Amino acid sequence: MKPETKLTFNILYNKGKLSDQTLLQLYRAMLKPRLIEDKMLILLRQGKISKWFSGIGQEAIAVGVTSALEKDEYILPMHRNLGVFTTREIPLYRLFSQWQGKANGFSKGRERSFHFGTQEFKIVGMISHLGPQLGVADGIALAHKLKKEQKITAVFTGEGGTSEGDFHEALNIASVWDLPVLFCIENNGYGLSTPTSEQYRCKNLIDRGIGYGMESHQIDGNNILEVFTKVSEIAESVRKDPRPVLLEFLTFRMRGHEEASGTKYVPEELMEEWALKDPISNFKNFLTEEGILSDETDEQFYNEIKAEINENLQLAFDEEVIVSTETDELNDVYKNIEYQHFEEKEEVETLRYIDAISQGLRQSMQRHEDLILMGQDIAEYGGAFKITEGFLEEFGKDRVRNTPICESAIIGVAMGLSIKGMKAIVEMQFSDFVTSGFNPIVNYLAKVNYRWNQPADVVIRMPCGAGVGAGPFHSQTNEAWFTKTPGLKVVYPAFPYDAKGLLNTAINDPNPVLFFEHKALYRSIRQEVPTNYYTIPFGEAALLKEGTEVSIITYGAGVHWALETLLEFPELSVDLLDLRTLQPLDTESIFISVKKTGKVLIITEDSLFGSVGSDISALIVENCFEYLDAPALRLGSLETPIPFATNLEQQYLPKNRLNQKLKELIEY
């Protein structure tokens, strides 16, 4: 029944062929997050919660987009998208427990608010850096496409987030690869307090789609029917014809960035203008005017939702404070796996270091049909060092993928593939270039298992090292950037045998692995290597020489410098330990050796301050001090960038100082 008094609404609605039931469902779906927020704001004022990021005024976007997706399609929301979580029907007690840091949440108290993810509800939570999740959406969509699943992925960002380089990279990759992603921009006028006029110069953000050859649509983000109808139509089309689509939703944030910051920077008349466009009150008036929503039904919705909120809040408040031990926390940093050992067979062939890596890659590709290789120039060209030469012909372009120069987003793609249960290897053309992808490695891959029990089954190959006259941007050995980041594993083999076996182990491991390959060893070191597929466990150093007078602990090229230098000390009895993996580190073998010899020299190609060598030295002093007959000595490169000229590079590297340093230790 229509009301006697005509109601006003400031949004033009077109219900089309939508049923009354669908219209009421959309209204109720928007009402639920609004009422939850109303309650949260009360609790905030009462001091019962510490912080709240409001999405009031933006409910139509989260609810409309989520309602247009199928339940098994992934969605990557932001911190204002409460409607995504409620529309996916996450039980409220679990949501409230999550916000309270309780055990019935999704992250064991390790993540707050909306940063968590859940495979059960196909939601992948954001990280505070905003941009990386765009690349992750690309990866999920790529997995759908490779598996020939007619599914789409939706990812949210704000107009402020579009200023990040990750936004460009993710859109670029999605357009080049025709990935079925809906890039949803919530343009709410302000990035915290920065207005759009100071954020970008284009008139509309959808104009950016032109540069990527990408279909783009601008949608009234406060009009639930426009959001739901248009996104439903686009989603259905993209499922049949995979491609990325850029969506700009025009809306407004009616509360502060978070409640403490307020909205004083917003002109009062602007707040008043957008208040008249409230998505819920306008839609309510429309439904009432159309005779679809009665006062009784509306009251019923309110009462049901409020009762659900209060009941589940009480459950969350009554839940005990989460209990965890140091062991519990440490055990969840990495995905626990049972190492699978594959024995090498007697048949061997002499391989260069580079060929052993290539052979390991090839055999792993044959073993794991869901393994995807990605990197610049790795397909037809075979990679900068020709390690993947011939792979394209054997495994096809779907699995051996040239990438744009978009390191950050490609690492995000690898993460997305892992979320879909696939494996990924990313080749950095040079390890120096990993700086362009540093953020997703240390903030996404490294933390995701600890945050919500989602492994990052990703290997990043890192051609590294000096001694090849490549200068400051193609010669770094930057393993220490990653060994100090919990959640990452770091491998650094010195020999062909180890390189192949450890690479196979890295690919089997569901945790993120940085696999360092020294360029100077690629074609200079040869060794007999088993022809079959085999693995070598992480965390086990190799004792290359056994002695009683001095311990030399090193890895990578340092192993070969030590072997060469020891030829000048034929009478010296030396323990030479090749670490092989730096995270996990074989501290047991280090301590056994040092306690036996009483003297230790640690060699690293890195400069010393903050290096792996420095950490090993500290561990030795803490655990073996009473066994030492001399200070634990370290030898590393100069504290300068890496020079290009041959004589300067030789001066920079520690190799030419090794003889003198060893004498110093012997004579102490």
Predicted regions: what they are:
Residues I42-K48, S113-I127, K151-A154, G189, ...:
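Glycine/charged-rich beta-loop-alpha catalytic/anionic-binding loops adjacent to active sites
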Residues G101-S107, S175-I185, R399-N402, A446-M462:
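A glycine-rich helix N-cap at a beta->alpha junction
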Residues L35-D38, I42-W177, P195-R201, I206, ...:
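Cofactor-binding active-site loop characterized by glycine-rich and histidine/acidic residues
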Residues M1-I61, A68-L69, F249, R255, ...:
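Conserved acidic/glycine
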Residues V63-K71, I140-E149, L171-L179, I210-G211, ...:
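Alpha-helix C-terminal capping segments
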Residues K122-E311, D318, T483-G598, I602-I603:
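Glycine-rich ThDP/TPP pyrophosphate-binding loop and its adjacent helix/strand module
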Residues K51-Q58, H79-R80, F116-L134, G158, ...:
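Active-site nucleophile and cofactor-binding loops and adjacent substrate-binding regions
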Residues D38, A103-T118, L205-I206, E380-E394, ...:
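Acidic-glycine-rich active-site phosphate/pyrophosphate-binding loop
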